């Protein structure tokens, strides 16, 4: 079982100091005073924070109907004195059952109408009646009046008259039979008592029988019962159609008594356990801290670290002293077993892998006896203290099964969401609703570019500092760290920069941290007068957070529970030069070519395209993640894909690889818990995201410098510079020419039956990529002009590098016929891969594809260049709807254009029906592809039917 380590929403304890103040009354909470907290997400770090209250002030803060609480949602109950545990349970019971006065209009009347009262079943025997103060029986009927829960008998005593029968009580049928019998008897007695109290004022001629409307018990014939005595149980049960009621009632009473005895025994044992725990606590609290640590070490137990280690040391000593010492974890072999008050169970402190905690848990693990050395026994006079008195920890069953209440967490704020940080995606899933506000890449609200480096704008002196460089190798003293753990709902970043003043010999080690995609976080800095001290501090912080040495970061190894180093590429910022030329103002390129170049190299367009993938663009300067980092992420997806085909699915390893992926490619989930990558659909989405990142990185690298030296680009329009970098000639087709008309006809004729689509043809550019024609394998024949759709942001990479096959690191899952380049003979099929919105332009390619001999397949099959059967050069996935061959056009350049009207093929081949709606053509060698046309269309509407 994978347990969640998310903090519980509430906590209770005896104040460990006298320094905290109550959040309600603002007064001091004294040392050892009982206090409660509301645990909510912090605004200062990626985690939760306790807001403490006096015990009574906490319950004033809680509002019925808005807040919910139960024992399972409170941390620390196990460590309270027994009387305080009982006090807490009664308070919770009162909070849950009591009703506001405004909801009990009966309190000001002397007549109770049974059909309008509020009742419920007592969930335990701990609650007490608001009138007589006696405990309820478990399962007993409780009636509410004036905000208090009463016995049904006590409730009836509050009124002068009773209107209705017990069967009128809402939910009457849901109560247990023995308590219904008891309630009927109490009801009859109450009626008789009220009648006797009014008898002196009753005329002699009046009937002694209550009015029919107030008679609760019916005879077997259905007539009112005239006797004033409590009716026999057999008569009452007979009303409900029960058979042999005496025997049934006896058995139920016997069972109830047995359960009550067992509950009483369990309660006494729990009290004993609590008293012993508290006795041991008092012993260990008197010891010096060094002696406590010595005892833990003697018993081969871990020494707690982190927040409030002293309290954790005492709790572990107390637990071990009473029950014995848990042995080392047998699941991961590197962690110790400790009691977790939030989970109400024992968990492992170790890590199964460098990315995931061990998921071991047990209510009562295997233990060894707890021992104290002779020296410490003599020193603290422990000779008369008996340890290891209980072999198993006891739990209250009904509380152990309760679910933790759900609390509305504070949601991610909009705008520029906190600290600048490099991360790739919002959630990149169909359920994410976190809004994205696209900011300006060069805005000082995000970062400041100084001397080819990016200075964190949160630093107060950022405008007069730059990132310090190593004088030997030129590397920058800055690090971006990431940590994601789904079980703890952690999605953290940590940034370190060593900054130098532009003018003076002043150095600053600046740190910022928080939760990715939110304003949660903080920052700090230290000042130094020389570089050596600053470098040592920078290296110390890096080692503290990662347990790796800075000088060996190129061989970084992720350590369990520590941050991971996110490898980033800042080289493009060193090449950015200011230009006074407005892009497009001086170029002599044709208008349509200029528009395409400006579009595919426009940073804002890249951001808008990334937004469609729900990627965050405010804190990810484009191109920052390195190729190596992206390839590592591909490998993780491949590992997850391999896990999903093996049954049963290993949920722990899925969790581990998900943590690893989100750590390598930081995502923004806001305050939501990161989702495991546990399906092929999610793998495909993440795979598409990584491919998009590669294309954007290529485009931005071209913008930042590419192959054109900055010295030769002075005075040249940026559009011309970027066009040269593409090394792809683009020539607009004359509207109305033969090729234009032919392509327009191809576009109109090949709309799929399942696609509701309306587009407008804007422009067609003829393409000629540098050296592509010379490599093109036209000799294998069977050339066709086929469609290929892609997001606009990918076109700088496509035009500059050609269409490419997915890298070896990418998973095979998501590709119906293996890793290759996919084409279609249906315009509408390829169009949906463009991810365009209404009124936006989309770009599609028409490619001359040398198919050669085609292997035709009816269903999915993993194919590669190496596994293609001998004599075949491509694969065709056969679809039901396709263009008629009779309408194809043989172009003078040597390829066929399948622009015929489409038709439905009614019968499959070789007795196998069609799995695909439309044809797919796949080649596994990029030299079988030659880009011919870029088609610009404007979308009016598009949807799948």
From Swiss-Prot:
A zinc finger (PARP-type) spans 10-96, 117-183. Residues 717-945 form the PARP catalytic domain. GO terms for cellular component: nucleolus. Residues 237-248 have a biased composition (Acidic residues). The lineage of its organism: Eukaryota, Metazoa, Ecdysozoa, Nematoda, Chromadorea. It comes from Caenorhabditis elegans. Residues 324-369 are annotated as: Zinc ribbon. Residues 195-251 are annotated as: Disordered. It is found in: Nucleus. This is Poly [ADP-ribose] polymerase 1.
């Amino acid at each position: 079982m994978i347990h969640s380590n998310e903090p519980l929403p509430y906590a209770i304890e005896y104040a460990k100091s006298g320094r905290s103040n109550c959040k309600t009354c603002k007064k001091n909470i004294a040392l050892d005073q009982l206090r409660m907290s509301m645990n909510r997400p912090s605004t200062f770090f990626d985690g939760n924070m306790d807001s403490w209250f006096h015990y009574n002030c906490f319950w004033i803060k809680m509002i019925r109907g808005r807040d919910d609480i139960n024992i399972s949602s409170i941390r620390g109950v196990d460590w309270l004195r027994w009387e305080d545990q009982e006090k807490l349970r009664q308070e919770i019971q009162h909070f849950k059952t009591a009703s506001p006065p405004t909801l009990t209009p009966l309190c000001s009347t002397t007549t109770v109408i049974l059909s309008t009262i509020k009742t419920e079943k007592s969930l335990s025997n701990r609650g007490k009646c608001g009138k007589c103060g006696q405990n309820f029986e478990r399962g007993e009927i409780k009636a509410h009046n004036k905000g208090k829960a009463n016995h049904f008998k006590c409730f009836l005593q509050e009124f002068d008259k009773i209107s209705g029968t017990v069967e009128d009580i809402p939910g009457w049928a849901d109560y247990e039979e023995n308590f219904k019998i008891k309630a009927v008897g109490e009801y009859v007695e109450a009626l008789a008592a009220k009648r006797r109290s009014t008898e002196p004022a009753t005329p002699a001629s009046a009937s002694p029988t209550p009015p029919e409307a107030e008679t609760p018990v019916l005879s077997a014939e259905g007539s009112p019962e005239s006797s004033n005595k409590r009716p026999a149980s057999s008569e009452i049960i007979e009303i409900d159609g029960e058979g042999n009621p005496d025997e049934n009632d006896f058995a139920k009473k016997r069972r109830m008594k047995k359960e009550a005895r067992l509950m009483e025994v369990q309660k006494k044992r729990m009290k004993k356990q609590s008293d012993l725990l508290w006795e041991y606590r008092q012993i260990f609290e008197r010891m010096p801290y060094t002696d406590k640590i010595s005892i833990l070490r003697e018993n081969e137990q871990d020494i707690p670290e982190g927040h409030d280690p002293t309290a954790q040391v005492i709790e572990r000593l107390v637990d071990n002293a009473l029950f014995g010492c848990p042995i080392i974890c047998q699941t991961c072999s590197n962690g110790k077993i400790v009691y977790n008050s939030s989970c109400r169970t024992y968990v492992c402190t170790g890590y199964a892998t460098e990315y995931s905690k061990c998921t071991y848990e047990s209510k009562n693990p295997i233990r060894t006896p707890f021992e104290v050395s002779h020296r410490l026994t003599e020193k603290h006079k422990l000779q008369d203290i008996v340890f290891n008195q209980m072999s198993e920890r006891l739990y209250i069953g009904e509380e152990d099964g309760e679910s933790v209440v759900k609390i509305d967490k504070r949601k991610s704020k909009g705008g520029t969401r906190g600290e600048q940080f490099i991360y790739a995606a919002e959630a990149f899933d169909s359920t994410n609703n976190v809004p994205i506000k696209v900011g300006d890449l060069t805005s000082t609200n995000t970062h400041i570019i100084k001397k080819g480096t990016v200075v964190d704008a949160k630093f107060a002196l950022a405008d007069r500092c730059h990132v310090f460089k190593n004088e030997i190798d030129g590397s920058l003293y800055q690090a971006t760290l990431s940590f994601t753990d789904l079980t703890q709902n952690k999605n953290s970043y940590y940034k370190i920069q060593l900054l130098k003043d532009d003018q003076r010999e002043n150095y600053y080690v600046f740190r910022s941290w928080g939760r990715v995609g939110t304003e949660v976080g903080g920052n700090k800095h230290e000042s130094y007068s020389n570089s050596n001290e600053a470098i040592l501090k920078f290296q110390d912080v890096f080692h503290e957070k990662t347990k790796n040495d800075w000088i060996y970061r190129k061989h970084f190894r992720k350590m369990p529970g520590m941050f991971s180093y996110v490898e980033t590429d800042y080289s493009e910022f060193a090449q950015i030069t200011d230009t006074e030329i407005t892009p497009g103002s001086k170029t002599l390129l044709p208008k349509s070519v200029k528009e395409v170049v400006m579009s595919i190299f426009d940073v804002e367009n890249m951001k808008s395209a990334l937004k469609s993938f729900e990627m965050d663009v405010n804190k990810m300067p484009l191109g920052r993640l390195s190729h190596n980092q992206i390839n590592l992420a591909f490998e993780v997806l491949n590992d997850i894909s391999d896990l999903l085909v093996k049954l049963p699915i290993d949920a722990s390893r899925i969790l581990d690889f998900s943590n690893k992926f989100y750590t390598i490619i930081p995502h923004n989930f806001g305050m939501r818990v990161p989702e495991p990558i546990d399906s092929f659909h999610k793998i495909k989405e993440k795979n598409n995201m990584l491919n998009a990142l590669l294309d954007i990185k290529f485009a931005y690298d071209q913008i930042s410098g590419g192959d054109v030296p900055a010295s030769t680009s002075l005075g040249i329009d940026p559009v011309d510079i970027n066009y040269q970098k593409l090394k792809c000639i683009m020539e607009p087709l004359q509207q109305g020419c033969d090729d234009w008309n032919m392509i327009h006809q191809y576009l109109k004729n090949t709309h799929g039956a399942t696609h509701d689509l309306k587009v407008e043809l804007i422009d067609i550019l003829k393409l000629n990529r540098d050296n592509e024609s010379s490599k093109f394998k036209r000799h294998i024949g069977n050339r066709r002009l086929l469609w290929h759709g892609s997001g606009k942001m990918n076109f700088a990479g496509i035009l500059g590098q050609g269409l490419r096959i997915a890298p070896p690191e990418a998973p095979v899952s998501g590709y119906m016929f293996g890793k290759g380049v996919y084409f279609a003979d249906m315009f509408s099929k390829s169009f949906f891969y463009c991810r365009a919105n209404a009124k936006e332009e989309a770009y599609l390619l028409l490619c001359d594809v040398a198919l050669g001999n085609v292997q035709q397949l009816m269903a999915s099959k993993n194919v590669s260049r190496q596994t293609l059967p001998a004599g075949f050069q491509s694969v065709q996935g056969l679809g039901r709807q396709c263009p008629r061959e009779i309408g194809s056009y043989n172009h003078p350049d040597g390829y066929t254009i399948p622009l015929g009207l489409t038709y439905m093929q009614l019968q499959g081949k070789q007795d196998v029906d069609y799995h695909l709606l439309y044809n797919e053509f796949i080649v596994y060698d990029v030299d079988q592809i030659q880009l011919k046309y870029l088609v610009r269309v404007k979308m009016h509407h598009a949807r799948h039917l």
